[in-house]
Amino acid sequence: MGSIYRSEHMKLCQIFFQSESAYQCVAELGELGMAQFIDLNEEQNAYTRKFVNEVRRCDEMERKINFVEDEITKDLVPIPDYDEHIPAPQPKHMGEMEANLEKLEEELVQINKNCKVLKNNHVQLLEMKAVLEHVTSLLDPHSKREAAMSISEAARGEAGPISFGMKDEFDKPVKDEKELKFVTGVVKRSKAIAFERFLWRLSRAKVFAKFIQIQEQTELFSNEFEDKCVFILFFSGEQLRAKVKKICDGFQAKCYTVPENPAERTKLLLNIKVQTTDMKAVIEKTLDYRSKCIHAAATNLRKWGIMLLKLKSIFHTLNMFSVDVTQKCLIAECWVPEADIGQVKNSLHMGTIHSGSTVPAILNEMETDKYPPTYFKLNKFTQGFQNIVDAYGIANYREVNPAPWTIISFPFLFAVMFGDAGHGIIMLIAASAFVIFEKKLISMKIKDEIFNTFFGGRYVVLLMGMFAIYTGFIYNDFYSKSVNIFGSSWVNPYNQTLLANMDAQGADSNTDLSLTFPPEIAFNHDYGPYPFGVDPVWNLAINRLNFLNPMKMKTSILLGISQMAFGIMLSLMNHIGNRSVVDIVFVFIPQCLFLGCIFVYLCLQVLMKWIFFYVKPAYIFGRLYPGSNCAPSLLIGLINMFMVKSRDASFAHDVGTAAGKEWVIVNGQNVTYTINDQCYLQQWYPNQSLVELILLLIAVVSVPVMLLVKPFYIRWRHSRGLHIDLGHGPDEHGEFNFGDIMVHQAIHTIEFVLGCVSHTASYLRLWALSLAHAQLSDVLWTMVLRMSLTMGGWGGSAAITILFYFIFSILSVCILILMEGLSAFLHAIRLHWVEFQSKFYGGTGIQFEPFCFTKIIRVYEGLDQ
């Protein structure tokens, strides 16, 4: 547990590179991923650094790759991932890469340009073809006469809305048909009505329009298809022709010149059909060639992207180095884990060899006051739990890491709230599938964020499922039902005749009669308690919640105070690691005393009440305990402790004397006694009031000790010029200010004192969520599955199948596992972040972010953020 218990020792190193070997050495360090470089040129802008031209060339190549990727995506061509290792390309190969990408870009741009022109020409030819095919019917004598009559009416001011199907006999004078001019073209069908109305209004009905829909598709090489219409516009006069063409341009209607001679139109139509066929063949060949280029580019795109990514990242890293006056040596500073310095030196040696340089890179370890970054060596199992801790804050350098303890406590507290063995089995199966097929799933490189969240935490979910099964057996809860594995410790004390008579009486009166099992005779004392978990008989009891709720509530308090106490113990490890005697003596010990004198004392009371105070009368701590009615009330007792309220010294007086008013049998002997008023509030062990008064005084005195001693100690050290560690992490700067230190210590003291109370209450969420999950599971069983089980015959079989497989299963997974599981997961995170980690964890450190090709490539592939 060494490396994950505390962060790795870090060293600030200075490396001297020869200019000709710097690139290859940095490439080797990128493959190793163990050096976090520091920018030594922060005061310089990006345009004045040494390798700015190389970075610009990389940016231009990146733009070209993005353009190619957009073209590939536009054609819906899949881009395969590249899984083989690709070494970083040499700087001398940049020219070749640029030439290849520039050639590909120019080729695609030219193909796109030619395709666009060819497609436009092809559309125009098809539209011209449609116009020629329909213009004969539009230019028939009937249409011309109809147009002439309409325009004549408009000229005399008698025109109304344009109408079709006019009678041949019309007694009004008409304009000569030979004087009519016409314009033909194509317009989108969706604009035809607006086009016609606009022409009618602007020309005052002196333009006559007719439309025929084109049945044949005119855009064969486009995914977008719009219906179009052939139109013909009749009018008189060349002046009106100019207006008509402007309107056509405004409605994006294309006008085509059509010969009036039918023979010429026929000849032109044949010619256009030949051109259309030839144009289609040319476009198909062009698109086929483009498709080959796109598929070839898609095969190598990820490879080019990774090569460029490594190239650019190396030059970006080199720009962080300082250059000596001779311009022949680069100087870098970086953080390296102390245990991996040997590997870094070996990578520098390999880089020098591969570059062909005769002068090796030199690494020197530096002494520094800079705050080191935090680095833990993790594996695929511990990574998920460390992510939970890091989401709160990065650990301070060499601070105790909560992750090792979170591996056990987090899934356990989750299971306390989730506790159902049946649902835990489903969760375990799902997580096991992730673990078993993890290599295959990793190779698939799934980029879905929700999937990656579950897959990244697969070992967390695996332990959550295991612990949920464990707590499910503790609660004896399996899909809201209990399982009788070992046999109940409770027996029926009533004879069958009495039960039969009561059953008949209940049936006659239409009421449900309930019986109470007296623990003195119904509990099998020889068999003892149920061997593991809750006795299954409680699942049948009416007062089931009256029994389970106090048990779960007290268990929550015990678990919560235990975890908080453990967190304070871990703070001792931080104080020892920091060699801070004042924190150990005047912070840690008062915290232990405050927590122990009040809350640990409460936990001891809970345990003693469970162990000693049974339903049977007995002598406990030398005092008569009359029975369960005198079992101590812990909550009111704790309040009386703070109020220093006087109480009787025992549960009863006049014990064993003739003055006793009541009697009980203890160890086979009759014992008389007179019970005290509110016996459950009285003292239940000798000198309880004195002990609690001492504990309360110790807790009260601990508060000013925590508040005052450390600030005045720091002030004393500062007055003598000694080193002061304020424990503020990497942001510890500025002059000494006693007021700030006093306020800081007061905040921590108040937070701890009030937090002990609020955090203890916060752990009651363990009980609340466990109750909610159990009740939801019971409701789902009662409302869904039990209804189908009560149905008989074929209908019952069908109901079981339908309700179980399609309703009960879906609701169980969606509500009880996913939603309730997420709720319990979030509450478990809160308990660890606030209640547990606040006792010892600073979380203000700096994450170690080494220059690592693996990390950069995963971000490029969309697998990491």
Swiss-Prot record:
Topological domain ranges for the Cytoplasmic compartment: 1-409, 475-556, 605-623, 710-798
Q: Which residues are glycosylated?
A: N578, N670, N687
Concerning Pfam families, the annotation shows:
V_ATPase_I
The keyword DNA damage is annotated on this UniProt entry? no
> Annotated Gene Ontology MF terms?
ATPase binding; proton-transporting ATPase activity, rotational mechanism
Protein task: Subunit of the V0 complex of vacuolar(H+)-ATPase (V-ATPase), a multisubunit enzyme composed of a peripheral complex (V1) that hydrolyzes ATP and a membrane integral complex (V0) that translocates protons. V-ATPase is responsible for acidifying and maintaining the pH of intracellular compartments and in some cell types, is targeted to the plasma membrane, where it is responsible for acidifying the extracellular environment. In the intestine, required for the rhythmic defecation behavior by promoting acidification in the gut lumen following defecation.
Q: What's the protein here called? A: V-type proton ATPase 116 kDa subunit a 3
State the organism of origin: Caenorhabditis elegans
